[in-house]
């Protein structure tokens, strides 16, 4: 489960409205341009207070604009229109959203909507917090180069579903287990640990039918440490890793919805911290798969949202997820709903509903495109970013 008090939350209606504006406003410009040519937390988190004081959403500082602004790329910021041109896309379509300008990027795969001065963006209606709020420089929208490389490029400019082009072995990690029960259902004496295991078993059957070789980190009610879960994936030379959880905001019963997590890229601030430390200079083994992580999280999250219209809490990035940090493969963590919300707890308690969750995940993962038994291609440039390169 995840404490919902940090990060960005907005209604799906707002996302839909932005997409409608983007699709309506960009059609003409596109034609014109065409004509022109707990067990998942870090060990450090385990020593934190059981109930940390509420902290406001992390707002990473925005680097200042160049001293002599111009419509040119800088060391840390790049013009959005130039990036679009380099990737064969139409120029950004202005949306004119008050109080700050908005822009839509139309592609054959969908629409990406952002606003200057705000970190929250949308890709096909799904929330994606950027690492840095886009800026206006010399009258043009600029994005931080890390967001261009680590967010836009994987979602818009990258090869679709590259996470499938890997070895066909996948490890499914049912969260919690044994004396680590996870969160308790608001409806009674049922716990997260049993629901995650049932979800994983259902998913195992479906993925096996699709051609994946599937291993579960646990197949019964036992406790596993973080290091054991990571070592299990290493032992089986997994190509993908999925950790399954259910959320809680107890005693608050109103919070609801789905969240999907991947590791924060080096150099960015996390969109969720839960009050724990978040050093952007840190690099972990899983940061070598930043692009695949985001693509995997995106496909899985969009598929899960189709299950009875869950509230969209977005694709999030966090650095304190110890079960992801040490993975040498694309890896994500899914929060499949709130056991502290009576309506969602009733759904989660229904085996038919857990089957739908499993089917949604299996649909998103599809069939593996087996090319070799080697691990997925690593992004070597993401492995080390010096502290000097992060300083202003």
Regions found by a protein language model. Give the residues of each.
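Short, basic, low-complexity termini and linkers enriched in Ser/Thr/Gly/Pro
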Residues: 3-18, 53-65, 367-392
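Active-site-proximal helix/loop segments of hydrolytic enzymes
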Residues: 190-374, 379, 385-392
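Residues embedded in well-ordered secondary-structure elements
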Residues: 14-15, 161, 249, 323
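Primary recognition of N-terminal secretory signal peptides and signal-anchoring hydrophobic helices
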Residues: 29-191, 195-198, 203-206, 210
